[in-house]
Amino acid sequence: PKENAAGGDSFTYSAANSAGAVSLPATVTVTIEKTRSGVTYADTGEATATAAQDLAERGVFTGAKIGDKWYFEPDRTVSRGEFLAMVLETAGAEVTDVTMTGFRDDDAIPTWAKSYAAAGVAEGILRGKPTENGAVFSCEDPISFSEAATVLNRVLDLGDVELEVWFADREAVPSWAAQAVGNMEALNVLSVGSFG
C-alpha cells in the first residue's frame, strides 16, 4: 500500500482439483489502519513493524526520532530501567511520581526511572541487586536475559513448571534465575540457548 494509506479490501476464492471438485468459497479481508501514534519506523522490517508500532501506540516504547524519522533501534541493548518501564507499562501497573526509591544507588537513577523502580518494588517484581550496603537498582546497566526472565516471571505469576521437563540448559543461567527461565521457556517467551 501507499505510505500513510488506510482502507480495506477483500476477495473471495475457491480451489479446484484436477478431478473437478471445487472447494467452498473463502473470503480474505485486508484492513490497513493509519497509525494512531504518528510513529512509523525507518528501521523495522515487515516481521517486526507491527509489534514495534503496537508498542508505540500503547506508549510503551517509541524509540528515537532523528531528524524527521523514527528509529525503533531493534539491535540496541536495553537497560534494566528501560526494560522495567516497558514491562510495567505493558502490564498496566500503577506508576506514581516519586523522588526516592529506597535503593542504595538512588542518586544514580534518572528521574524518569525512579517512579518505575518504586512501582516495581511495590508490585513485588523488582528487588534489585544485593550489595553489602543494601540493594541497588543499577538502572543504566544492560538487562540480561536471566534478569528479564525473572521480571517477566514475577509479572506473569503463572506458577512453576517442572524444570527437568522444560529447562534443558539449567547450567547456562544463574541458580537464582533457573525457575524463571524454565517458566518462560514453557510459555515460549524464551527458547533454550537464548538467555545469558
How should these model regions be labeled?
Residues 1-34:
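Acidic, turn/loop-rich segments in luminal/extracellular domains of secretory-pathway
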Residues 19-21, 49, 111, 120, ...:
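Amphipathic alpha-helical interaction segments
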Residues 5, 15-17, 63, 117-120:
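Small side chains
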Residues 56, 117, 121-122, 185:
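Alpha-helix C-terminal capping/helix-coil junction sites
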Residues 33-50, 57, 62-84, 88-115, ...:
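Feature responds to low-complexity, polar/acidic, surface-exposed segments characteristic
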